From Swiss-Prot:
Protein's name according to its UniProt entry: Probable tRNA pseudouridine synthase D
PROSITE patterns, alphabetized: TRUD (PS50984), UPF0024 (PS01268)
Disulfide bond residue pairs: none
BP term (GO), one: pseudouridine synthesis
EC numbers for this chain: 5.4.99.27
This protein's UniProt keywords: Isomerase, tRNA processing
An example Gene Ontology molecular-function term: RNA binding
Its job: Could be responsible for synthesis of pseudouridine from uracil-13 in transfer RNAs.
Pfam families (alphabetical): TruD
HAMAP family: TruD
Family: Belongs to the pseudouridine synthase TruD family.
Reactions listed under catalytic activity: uridine(13) in tRNA = pseudouridine(13) in tRNA
Source organism per UniProt: Saccharolobus solfataricus (strain ATCC 35092 / DSM 1617 / JCM 11322 / P2)
Keyword Signal attached: no
Amino acid sequence: MTPHEIDIALGMEKYYYEDWNELDGTIERPNGFKVIEEIDFKPAQDWKGETKGKYAVFLLTKWGIDHFSAISEVQKVLHSKVNYIGIKDANAITSQLVYIPLNEKQELIEKYQSRSFILKFLGFSSKKLNHTGNIFEISLSISDFDIVIERIEQIKKNPYLPAFIGYQRFGTRRPITHLIGKYLLRRDWEKAFYLILTYPFLSESKETIDIRKLIMEGDFKEAVRSIPSKFKQEKLLLKNYMRFNSYYLALKSSFIPISLYLDAYQSYLFNLYLSRKLDEYKNLNDKVNLLIRIPIYFNNCDDVCKEIYLDEGIERNFFKLQEFKISLRDLVRKAFMNIRDLKVNEETKTISFVLERGMYATILLREILRGDPRKFT
């Protein structure tokens, strides 16, 4: 089966099981998609802190809010820079540990609740938290659940799937983060700026589409008045462009770290490479230790990598963005993800499983359900 056009646009050109057809299944978001950080092979909420230490550790449970907005809110509540282990899905119910450095004036909050997250103090720690993976529980709305069970049973016999970098890295509703990264690396500040603020997608709300159209038409004053506060990135960039009349200086003020856009472009290159090597890799016995390296230097590429780089127009020093003091490194990542504790509840039509840090549940859903990823992301 040929993957969906969104998959192709994100570099995911193949499935592992080529003969499976599309299933008409959806997931109710955020309630049907739960993610719990796994610390020392236990759920985050079971983490036991010490009575004292260098860091105060909290359990952050959030829903319907993106990672950076949630962290920004938590920092205001705790009056401190907040550290975290991983970036969790915005359109899900997620639980993870966050921690802050202690100082003499620090006043700790036992519990805090807002409309989109709950923060609960768990204890102290002086050592690095051992993030062993993420636990997923996903409820499907589907009539052909018997086929889902069959596919899961087949995957359990060989619990490895391609470790594609999932939709969240590129934007689930506007999958263009990697393109923004590409234009940043080309130093086309204007194109990167307008990709962030304009180019509306039909999956967005009418209000958002109308605002993006205002910016496209050059009506910045009306657009900046109309942008809801939750769109922090768009509002900040537009305000700073109006202030400095410079796309570069506007991008320098980015609420979202510029490095995330560049990482997304590297992720796209990884997906392309894995897609084109997948038939070869599927036949290898050792899927546990197989690593892929996406180098920053053309001369370190193999033939497949060189072909991709030539197609993309990647030149010498392409991965150095000195204007933002960013130098990317080689991207090294496992070729396959191991799916642990894969279980099915036929009564509730729920599947649960554990993935290593940095692996994406939506890639398992993609393999099982096929078709338009907007149904399950």
